[in-house]
């Protein structure tokens, strides 16, 4: 059982919901990434999603696009991202870390080389936005052989066939994108999310995390009632954008602690 699987199983056994915050590696500054990772855990995160900066992040809204631009301007590469995970692992060997990004940086490195380097760094899974499950069977299999989980996206427009492909090739959890659009968009319809997740669960036996559009404790709590975990990204990046550099880590920890409290009530 992978670290992601055991974490989510332990939460389910306690009737608790997973909290999965997202930050972009290297934003707002490379030296803050590892302190932010630890602060998110201290605030109650169960799994961390670390975004790999990319110049054309097509699924992201303007907030995460800006985060990618800032990280790239600091020269953050895939090598650096794996270095952040290695540094984090020196003092935390229990919280799963998922890398989220796009195929290009992985292809540049080479799939096998990336997987071995990610395993050595202490990565637990990947979400590659432009790797549909039916096109990356070998990548998914190699990840699993190395005790990492290939995590795939599902959306309101996913076909039955796509859902079955995710059930076949995915592991760890499935990531349901709650909105038609980009990250950070507004107004989640929790009734619609509940209906879609019920349809997905006919095929997918993995835990389901929901992201895109979760901006506050009330929305997180509502979404958690129909899912296994909530993913929050753009709202955290906004907190970083609006915080003086010296207060950024503390403010993010306070924000995520508020979400944790709401999920546990």
UniProtKB/Swiss-Prot annotation:
Keywords: Amino-acid biosynthesis, Aromatic amino acid biosynthesis, Lyase, Tryptophan biosynthesis
Gene3D superfamilies in UniProt: Aldolase class I (3.20.20.70)
Root EC class: lyase
Enzyme Commission numbers on file: 4.2.1.20
Pfam family name, one: Trp_syntA
Matching PROSITE patterns: TRP_SYNTHASE_ALPHA
Catalytic activity of the protein: (1S,2R)-1-C-(indol-3-yl)glycerol 3-phosphate + L-serine = D-glyceraldehyde 3-phosphate + L-tryptophan + H2O
Catalytic site positions: 49, 60
Family from the record: Belongs to the TrpA family.
Classification via NCBIfam families: trpA
HAMAP family: Trp_synth_alpha (MF_00131)
Protein's UniProt name: Tryptophan synthase alpha chain
Originating species: Janthinobacterium sp. (strain Marseille) (Minibacterium massiliensis)
Gene that specifies this protein: trpA
């Amino acid at each position: 059982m992978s670290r992601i699987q055991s974490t989510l199983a332990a939460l389910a056994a306690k009737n608790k919901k997973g909290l999965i915050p997202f930050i972009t590696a290297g934003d707002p500054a490379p030296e803050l990434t590892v302190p932010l990772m630890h602060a998110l855990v201290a605030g109650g995160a169960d799994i961390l999603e670390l975004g790999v900066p990319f110049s054309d992040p097509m699924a992201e809204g303007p907030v995460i696009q800006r985060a990618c631009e800032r990280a790239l301007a600091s020269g953050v590469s895939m090598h650096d991202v794996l270095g952040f995970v290695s540094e984090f692992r020196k003092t935390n060997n229990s919280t799963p870390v998922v890398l989220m990004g796009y195929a290009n940086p992985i292809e540049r490195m080479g799939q096998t080389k990336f997987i071995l380097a990610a395993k050595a760094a202490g990565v637990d899974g990947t979400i590659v936005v432009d790797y549909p499950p039916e096109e990356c069977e070998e990548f998914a299999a190699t990840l699993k052989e190395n005790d990492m989980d290939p995590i795939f996206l599902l959306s309101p427009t996913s076909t039955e066939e796509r859902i079955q492909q995710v059930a076949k090739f995915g592991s760890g959890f499935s990531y349901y994108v709650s909105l038609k659009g980009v990250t950070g968009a507004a107004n989640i319809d929790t009734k619609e999310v509940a209906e879609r997740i019920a349809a997905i669960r006919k095929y997918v036996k993995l835990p389901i995390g929901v992201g895109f559009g979760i901006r506050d404790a009330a929305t997180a709590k509502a979404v958690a009632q129909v899912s296994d975990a909530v993913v929050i990204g753009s709202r955290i990046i906004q907190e970083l954008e609006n915080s003086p550099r010296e207060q950024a880590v503390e403010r993010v920890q306070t924000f995520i602690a508020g979400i944790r409290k709401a999920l546990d009530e």
